[in-house]
């Protein structure tokens, strides 16, 4: 994050976010609804995982991942100096997985003219464009042996590069080519491996659970969470728990909008909306830009696909309606300010106070929305490389 005059104040707010949430009575979706939790030294984020596993962090090199499968790929900058041209379309993205997130700086390129727009980008790679529905698997690995896996099945329909929902079940099998790749390339590894793929071609690998462990936590399964702790902190597996690692399947939905976001519901209003729709206790604001086309703004879970999709559409409609009403009120307030109405300043104060209720949320929620909007409007900027990261 670039330092500005607001950085100290922002850092203060983020450092004290937990105190703010407790004072305001905001629940923690990763802890409060569940009896069983992730514990011990399990890494949650990619950068932490990269540092925790120095002998296996080569998987964060997406170019190496592509080349390990004999997928046509290379460094982006080399395409501007070689006479050998790739077969379009190609896909370009940041090379280093621990230094990038979501779909930042990921583009489908159809010809050289489109490619030229990114000539100044460093630390990028290209590969053959792989079409098809995405899939993802979390592996629990002990000394190179896959002890357990949970595979996430993505919706066929997508908004840009993001799915509409995922189906999470302990019964969904992993494609054999994916598990074979993990076994072949991480022979002496112990920990978590998250693998994302399209048409059985691996596109990204991380040494941590998907979505900061949210999908595993939402199972509230004692056996799974205990054996994750056993593997990472004790270097062992409790086989007596194997018969208890099944869980009720569910769907994780992403709410998406193309409308500019000018207002978000206060946390307690969000609680009322979501809890009245689903009995699944995990939900959170989740801001994920989809290029410049729109943004994911919420994730929630449900046991039934049709009911969940209906809820998703209702929430998306309410959210768009909220943006429209907010925009109308902003325009109306500006018009009132230029009128001769005696109470216009009282009205202005009321409208400002009403608008500021959008900040009655965890500070991190407002910050992630700001980052997402900045990316949507201005782009991500060139990605960074390992030499630009300090401990």
Q: PLM features: what roles do these ranges have?
A:
Residues 157, 172-341, 357-390:
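ATP-dependent carboxylate activation and anion-phosphoryl transfer catalytic cores
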Residues 338-350:
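Hydrophobic alpha-helical transmembrane segments
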Residues 37-41, 70, 79, 230-238, ...:
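Short loop/turn hinge sites at secondary-structure boundaries
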Residues 45-181, 312-315:
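Active-site nucleotide/adenylate-binding loops and adjacent lid/helix of ATP-dependent enzymes
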Residues 16-28, 131-140, 187:
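Short, mixed-charge, low-aromatic patches
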Residues 352-356:
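Cytoplasmic C-terminal tails of single-pass
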């Amino acid at each position: 994050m670039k330092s500005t005059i607001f950085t100290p104040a922002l850092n203060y707010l983020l450092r004290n976010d937990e105190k703010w949430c407790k004072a305001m009575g905001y629940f923690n979706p990763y802890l409060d609804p569940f009896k069983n939790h992730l514990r011990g030294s399990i890494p949650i984020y990619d950068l932490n995982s990269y540092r925790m596993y120095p002998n296996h962090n080569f998987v964060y090199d997406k170019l190496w991942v592509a080349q390990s499968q004999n997928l046509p790929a290379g460094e982006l900058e080399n395409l501007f100096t070689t006479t050998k041209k790739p077969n379009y379309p190609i896909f370009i993205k940041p090379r280093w997985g621990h230094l990038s997130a979501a779909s930042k700086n990921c583009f489908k390129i159809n010809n050289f003219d489109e490619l030229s727009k990114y000539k100044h980008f460093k630390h990028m790679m290209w590969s053959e464009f792989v079409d098809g529905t995405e899939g993802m698997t979390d592996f629990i690995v002990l000394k190179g042996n896959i002890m357990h896996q949970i595979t996430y099945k993505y919706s066929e329909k997508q908004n840009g590069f993001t799915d509409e929902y995922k189906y999470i079940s302990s019964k969904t099998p992993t494609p054999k080519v994916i598990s074979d790749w993990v076994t072949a390339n991480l022979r002496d590894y112990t920990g978590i491996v998250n693998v994302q793929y399209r048409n059985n071609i691996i596109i990204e690998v991380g040494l941590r659970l998907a979505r900061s462990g949210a999908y595993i936590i939402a199972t509230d399964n004692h056996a799974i969470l205990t054996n994750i702790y056993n593997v990472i902190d004790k270097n062992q597996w409790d086989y007596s728990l194997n018969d208890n690692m099944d869980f009720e399947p569910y769907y994780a939905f992403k709410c998406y909008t193309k409308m500019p976001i000018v207002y978000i519901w206060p946390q307690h209003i969000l609680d009322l909306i979501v809890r009245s729709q689903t009995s699944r206790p995990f939900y959170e604001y989740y801001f994920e830009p989809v290029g410049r086309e729109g943004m994911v703004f919420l994730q929630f879970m449900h046991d039934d696909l049709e009911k969940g999709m209906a809820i998703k559409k209702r929430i998306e409609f309410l959210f768009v309606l909220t943006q429209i009403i907010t925009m109308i009120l902003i325009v109306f307030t500006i018009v009132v300010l230029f009128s001769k109405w005696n109470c216009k300043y009282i009205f202005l104060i009321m409208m400002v106070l009403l608008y500021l209720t959008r900040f009655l949320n965890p500070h991190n929620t407002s910050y992630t929305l700001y980052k997402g909007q900045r990316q949507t409007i201005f782009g991500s900027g060139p990605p960074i490389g390992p030499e630009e990261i300090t401990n």
